[in-house]
Curated annotation (Swiss-Prot):
Pfam families: FlgI (PF02119). It is found in: Periplasm; Bacterial flagellum basal body. This is Flagellar P-ring protein. Belongs to the FlgI family. Residues 1-24 form the signal peptide. One of its GO terms (cellular component) is outer membrane-bounded periplasmic space. It comes from the Bacteria. Keywords: Bacterial flagellum, Periplasm, Signal.
Length: 348
């Protein structure tokens, strides 16, 4: 009988969520996470074998000792001083253990050289235990390493290269309370989540306690799993902070199309760039996009349609001036500090 009532409540709340979602824009699970349910970092020390003379040199004593220890585990006894191999490299292996991962699940891993190897390309990672901060082994890693397009052959990945051996227990079912944590602190968004949840469930089940934290109390007729599943689907009118994400290795820059830069002059090394609302006095000025003009001779970027130059236009201009990804990062950070750029910058 109770299960029937629960089903009715579930359908009623889900219907209410759909009707309210039309008024809002961002799901809670996209901007907040449930405290305690998170990824856990794993790390391990291992050896990559099968290298064509590009491994660690004999001067890397920890590598030679590790080889000796590995051989001893299969009843081959040698002193570390007797090993002269260049086909092996010592590496650190890292992975992320997602919540609710089960034994046998596969994890992607990152393998990075820590010795003086020239390259670990073509190598195979020997079985490596991956431990958590508590010292327990949660996964075993092994496999052939693949590399991206960055050009580096000292750090690579193995897709599905680790197998989960130990699970992290999450006791949700019998819980009565939970906590949401916003990914970015914002008082307005915390209050919006509180109001949206209380509207959906028609009860005071959510209380914002600060700019990041919302306390939740489960309704009596729902399990915690059912409750959190519904909470994650509720949408709010999210107040978004503009953000620029930069991958320094690849040079990739991701920014919202509407992020603009106010007039400013920045000098970084040999590069001087001026953001202006006046047309450059240069017949060889280049048109970039959205009416933005760039004068290479004057180091000026300006807009011809009355709007401010966008981050995209400025980045393209800097690249034409020969700026490296590191130069671009430094210049954008200087613009942010001066107040000309109103956006958070995240460097990966």
């Amino acid at each position: 009988m109770r299960r029937k009532n629960n089903n009715k409540i579930w359908i009623w709340v889900a219907t209410l969520i759909l009707s309210i979602s039309a008024l809002y824009g961002q799901k809670i699970n996209q901007i907040a996470q449930i405290v305690g349910i998170r990824d856990n970092s794993l790390v391990g020390y291992g050896l990559v074998i099968g290298l064509n003379g590009t491994g660690d040199k004999s001067g890397s004593k920890f590598t030679m000792q590790s080889i000796a220890n590995m051989l001893e585990s299969v009843n081959v006894k040698l002193s570390a001083n007797d090993i002269k191999s260049k086909n092996v490299a010592a590496v650190m292996v890292t992975a992320s253990l997602p919540p609710f991962a089960r034994q046998g699940d596969k994890l992607d891993i990152l393998v990075s050289s820590i010795g003086d190897a020239k390259s670990i390309n073509g190598g195979t990672l020997v079985m490596t235990p991956l431990t958590g901060v508590d010292g327990n082994i949660y996964a075993l890693a092994q496999g052939n390493i693949t590399f991206g397009e960055s050009g580096s052959t000292l750090s690579g990945t193995i897709i599905g290269g680790a197998s989960v051996e130990r699970e992290i227990a999450y006791n949700l079912y019998n819980q009565e309370n939970a906590t949401l944590s916003l990914k970015s602190s914002d008082l307005q968004n915390a209050i919006k989540i509180q109001q949206a949840l209380n509207d959906v469930f028609r009860d005071a089940i959510a209380v914002a306690v600060d700019a990041r934290t919302i306390k939740l109390k489960k309704p009596e007729n729902l399990s915690m799993v059912e409750f959190l599943a519904l909470v994650e689907e509720v949408e709010i009118d999210y107040s978004r902070k503009e953000r620029i994400v930069i991958d320094e290795k690849s040079g990739t820059i991701v920014a919202g199309v509407g992020i603009t830069i106010d007039p400013v002059v920045v000098t970084h090394g040999d590069i001087t760039i001026k953001i202006s609302d006046e047309m450059p006095d240069d017949p060889e000025a280049i048109k970039l996009e959205d009416g933005t003009m760039m004068s290479r001779a004057q180091g000026t970027i300006s807009s011809t349609n009355g709007t401010k130059p966008t981050v995209s236009s400025v980045v393209k201009a800097l690249q034409r001036m020969g700026a490296t990804p590191r130069n671009v990062i430094s210049i954008l950070e200087s613009m942010k500090k001066s107040g000309a750029l109103n956006a958070d910058i995240e460097v990966m």
